[in-house]
A protein has these predicted regions:
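Soluble or luminal CAZymes and related metallo-dependent hydrolases
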Residues: 69-73, 116-120, 163, 244-248
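Active-site loop segments of alpha/beta catalytic cores
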Residues: 90, 105, 111-212
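Short, well-ordered coil/turn elements that cap or connect secondary structure elements
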Residues: 83-85, 137, 176-178, 222, ...
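Alpha/beta catalytic barrel-like cores
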Residues: 1-109, 200, 225, 253-261, ...
């Protein structure tokens, strides 16, 4: 509950459901996603023990809901925001990343692919149903976390790129039926390919190669897409001041503008976030990261208003 209240206080416009793997390793992204798959045991340390003979793509999840140990943070969050009418953010591990994790512990690539798609589909439905019960008047934003997309063009990638994108796209389409669909990828990727999965919001870190795919991002913005810019690094000590982070963000936008992106749309359709999750931080450090992201967002809003740019909602 403390983490849920922190999320509401730190990001009142779009609070995010916390995952708490330091409370229980089963809340780690792979463990959480694999929970309930027949033939997969999630151990207390979050690792997976697989009985490959029991892996069956046709079998339903043993536990496909959000009532188990891996979803304590989510349930606390939904309890705290009960009755909310403003948007809020949920996140689940995407099917491609789960498929890669299953394959890494010995599941045949084709079966891992099929099982992961079904598991994530079931979990999306359960999470959004729980969100509707908690806040029927609100529109949730559900992000699929797909770090696996950073490896999609590597020579040893076990799946065809088109099939991988179709897998993610199918999950995105399900989300979009009752929520705003976001896609988070926490490293450098082929953003033109990633956008083929069809997110309404793309979340990526500043400095992750966006300028190399300016044309694809320009088209995405023109079609109504939003970009969540991970402008506050979360992969090490907090050593950069807000002014430095602002300059990094502005330099990225300058590069995109020079490559053809509409500078007004870049700012109108921007969300400022930490680069990734806060699992490695103590509460005081998490507060600092959140405060930096809020400061950058307020600075963007102030400068945009000063130049007549309408940031909308």
């Amino acid at each position: 509950h403390e983490a849920a209240l922190f999320a509401l206080d730190a990001h009142p416009k779009l609070p995010a459901a916390p995952s708490l793997p330091r409370r229980s390793a089963t809340e780690g992204m792979v463990a959480q996603a694999a929970w309930g798959i027949p033939g997969v045991m999630v151990l207390d340390d979050g690792s997976l023990l697989v009985d490959e003979a029991a892996i069956d793509p046709a079998a339903p999840l043993v536990d496909g809901g959000v009532g188990g140990e891996p979803f304590v943070g989510l349930r606390a969050f939904l309890e705290v925001l009960a009755g909310r009418v403003g948007p809020f953010k949920l996140q689940l591990t995407g099917p491609l990343t789960l498929a890669l994790a299953l394959h890494a512990v010995g599941v045949d690539a084709d079966r891992a692919f099929a099982v992961a798609g079904k598991a994530v589909t079931a979990r999306i439905g359960a999470a959004l149903a729980a969100a509707r019960r908690a806040a029927p008047g609100a529109t949730p934003v559900l992000f699929l976390d797909e770090p696996g997309l950073t490896a999609a063009l590597d020579p040893g990638f076990p799946f065809e790129l088109e099939s991988a994108l179709d897998l993610v796209s199918s999950a995105m389409a399900l989300v979009e039926e009752s929520a705003i669909a976001g896609l988070h990828c926490c490293g450098r990727a082929d953003w033109q390919a990633v956008l083929q999965a069809g997110p309404q919001i793309l979340s990526l870190p500043v400095g992750a190669g966006a300028v190399e795919h300016a044309g694809a991002l320009a088209g995405f913005l023109e079609r109504g897409g939003w970009i969540a810019w991970g402008a506050v690094p979360t992969d090490g000590p907090l050593t950069m001041a807000a002014d430095v982070l602002w300059r990094h963000l502005w330099a990225e936008w300058d590069g995109l503008t020079a490559a053809g992106c509409d500078p007004v749309l870049l700012r109108q359709r921007a969300i400022i976030t930490p680069a990734c999750g806060l699992v490695g931080f103590e509460p005081r450090q998490a507060e600092q990261v959140s405060a930096l992201a809020a400061h950058l967002a307020q600075r963007l809003e102030s400068q945009s208003l000063g130049t007549g740019v309408d940031l909308g909602a």
